[in-house]
Each structure stands twice: as structure tokens, then as C-alpha cells.
A protein has these predicted regions:
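Conserved phosphate-binding elements of NTP-dependent enzyme cores
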Residues: 1-364
Length: 364
């Protein structure tokens, strides 16, 4: 007798629903419309991004990159890993697969502790953010924007920072008032003085190209690229567009972003890397099927640039585009930690011990 409402992107969950509401057409300010509502059967016929993606099954890649080398993991016993030994390929895109709790993250944690070179970890727990973190501060372009305002108005740069002299006196630049409810979760309300802009009234009087600092910081990444045109930091903004985050606002609190979005913000700052090893922890978390398709193009480009990618992932669409798959299991916790399979996606289809094999076959 319960009503269950699920925010979801997975094909399998969408197919189980009695009623589906498809939002769009895009993300951020370009979304917010109901594109379709009704049954799953009719969604498959609908001319929406979701409908088109559900009608299309991602093909399996049949030509695989050749590893430039291998790293041998020997007798790993971290957490639930059961004396696990496996050769990990370098210079290619590898998916670390397995059911929840099977030891995927433990394997990568052990690898990072043993590998003699640098490893770039892009995992949700590694991204340090707080209530004041925004895409502008994370990409280190906020100072450059403040400098433009300061130069145009002949005042100190600190006036255009909500972490300094420009902060709203009521909320101290947070944009919200946090009320501590003792035995209950804290309640956040929009600041009534600055109305969420984070800045003092005095600062908002200053303008650059007809906009005040709050209006500029409230722009989306795509809008900011057009507004600032030839500024040096536009290149950094473009990296967010490349990872599919052009809809984010410069001042958007990063605490509002999904795990997948957070990883892509960090990934944006690493797009020019060559010959590096990356570990990505479920980067498709919270992503639409179309977002995953675009993300895989980016991952393939990174691999072609000579990087090694290890992707901890459950998405079959990602597995089908990998060069190599390492599967752990068979279960989670104490029932996991064993090597079930290591090879190409095509070889997985014939692997009798693989738990994932059955689902990979069904997805073709």
C-alpha cells in the first residue's frame, strides 16, 4: 500500500516502474520541463533523450588497446581481499567490477599503497569540499574574476570575496542561515538579508560589463565563457563543458552536487595529463544514459593520450567500452574478495565463474 518515488537512471529500474516522469530536455537552466509521463512501453516510443537511449543498446567494443605494461598485485589481504593476486594492465581502460562489497575499492586501495609511481585518485571521498566550495573556487578562477572587478572599480579585490570583506554580515557569506536543532538535523534557510547571494549590499553596487559580482557568479559555466570571452581562465571553464558540466553555476555550492558530478569537477582539472594512472570510483553515479555516453568518449580520449584508467563501476555500458575487466566476488563482505575474472569484455562472456557475465550477455 506504499507509494514509492525513485529518482533513477538505470535501465533496469526504469523498466520496473509503473509510471515514469521524464524531465528535461537538458540539465540546469535548460531543464525543468516534463518531457514525458506514462508507461515504460510508451517511453520506448517517445522522442525524448531518455526514450532514444533506452531504445538503443550499447554495442560491445571488439577491438582492444594493447597494454603498455603490467603491474602484478601479489597476495593482497587488505580488508576482505583473500590473498588476491592479479596482473593489472597499464596504458588501457580497465573496469574493476563486482557486486557491492566485493572488494573493488580495497583492491584499488592496495594497488595505490604498493605502486611506486604517482596515482591520481578521483573518488568521492577524496574530494575535499565544504559549504563555501564552488566550481569557481575549486578551479581556482574566483580570484581572477575578483581581480577584473577590482580593476574596473578601483577598489580592493577582497571586497568581491564572500569569504572576506564582501561577505554578507548576516550569514557571513554562506548564503544560508543554519539553525542547530539540538536533537534533530540542522535546518538551512536562505539568508533574508542577501537573499542567498552571499555578498553585502555595498559590494553589489560595483559592476563589471554591466553586471555585479553576484550576477556574474550566478552565471552558468557556458554563460560565463561567453561573458568573459578572451580571459585566460576561460580555458578552465571549458574543461567543465568537456566533462558535461556546462550547466553548473559558478557559485553553486558543491555540497549540492551528486557523487558523479563531484568527480567530474575534479576530473576537469586533469584533462591535459599524459602518461598518468587514474582511479575513478563509480564515475557514472547519478548520471543519465546520455551523460554516460559522453563521459565514455572523454575516458577514451584520456586513454588515447597515454593514460591508464582503472574505473570501479557497475554500469554495463561502461564495461562494454572497456579494454579489460577485473571482476571480484562472488558476494559482498566475507563472501567476496576473490578474483572471478580478468580479461577482455568479449572473454567475460565465456567466463563460467563470472557473476556479471549473465547480465552482460542480456545487455547486448
Amino acid at each position: 500500500g506504499n507509494t514509492v518515488m525513485i529518482v533513477e537512471h538505470h535501465r533496469e529500474v526504469i523498466a520496473l516502474a509503473d509510471h515514469i516522469v521524464d524531465m528535461g530536455p537538458e540539465a540546469g537552466i535548460n531543464g525543468g520541463q516534463i518531457m514525458y509521463q506514462g508507461s515504460y512501453e510508451n517511453l520506448l516510443k517517445a522522442d525524448t533523450v531518455t526514450g532514444r537511449m533506452l531504445r538503443t543498446k550499447t554495442p560491445m567494443k571488439m577491438e582492444y588497446r594493447k597494454p603498455t605494461g603490467w603491474y602484478q598485485v601479489e597476495h593482497a589481504k587488505l580488508h576482505n581481499l583473500k590473498d588476491l593476486s592479479v596482473k593489472l594492465p597499464l596504458g588501457v581502460m580497465t573496469v574493476i567490477a563486482g557486486v557491492a562489497g566485493s572488494g573493488k575499492s580495497s583492491l584499488m586501495e592496495y594497488f595505490m599503497s604498493q605502486y611506486p609511481g604517482e596515482v591520481i585518485s578521483i573518488r568521492q571521498k577524496d574530494i575535499g569540499i565544504n559549504l563555501r566550495s564552488t566550481p569557481a573556487t575549486y578551479l581556482d578562477i574566483a580570484d581572477a574574476i575578483r581581480a577584473l572587478f577590482a580593476k574596473a572599480n578601483h577598489v580592493a579585490q577582497a571586497y568581491f570575496s564572500f569569504n572576506s570583506k564582501g561577505a554578507c554580515p548576516a550569514c557571513q557569506g554562506k548564503g544560508v542561515i543554519i539553525s542547530d536543532m539540538a536533537y534533530m538535523d540542522s535546518i538551512e534557510t536562505v539568508c533574508e538579508v542577501c537573499h542567498g547571494t552571499r555578498y553585502s549590499k555595498e559590494v553589489l553596487k560595483y559592476q563589471y560589463k554591466g553586471k555585479n559580482i553576484a550576477e556574474v557568479m550566478d552565471m552558468t559555466v557556458r554563460q560565463a565563457i561567453q561573458f568573459f570571452e578572451d580571459a585566460d581562465f576561460v580555458k578552465k571553464l571549458d574543461t567543465l563543458v568537456q566533462v558535461g558540466l556546462g550547466y553548473l553555476h559558478l557559485n553553486q555550492s558543491m555540497t549540492t552536487l551528486s557523487g558523479g558530478e563531484l568527480q567530474r569537477v575534479k576530473l576537469a582539472s586533469k584533462l591535459d595529463e599524459r602518461g598518468q594512472i587514474f582511479i575513478l570510483d563509480e564515475p557514472t553515479d547519478g548520471l543519465h544514459l546520455d551523460d554516460i555516453r559522453r563521459l565514455m568518449k572523454l575516458f577514451n580520449r584520456m586513454t588515447d593520450q597515454g593514460n591508464t584508467l582503472f574505473i570501479i563501476e557497475h554500469s554495463l555500458d561502461v564495461m562494454k567500452d572497456a579494454d579489460y575487466i577485473v571482476e571480484l566476488g562472488p558476494g559482498g563482505g566475507l563472501a567476496g574478495g576473490s578474483l572471478l575474472f580478468a580479461g577482455t569484455p568479449k572473454e567475460m562472456l565465456e567466463a563460467e565463474r563470472s557473476v556479471t557475465r549473465e547480465y552482460l550477455r542480456e545487455s547486448l
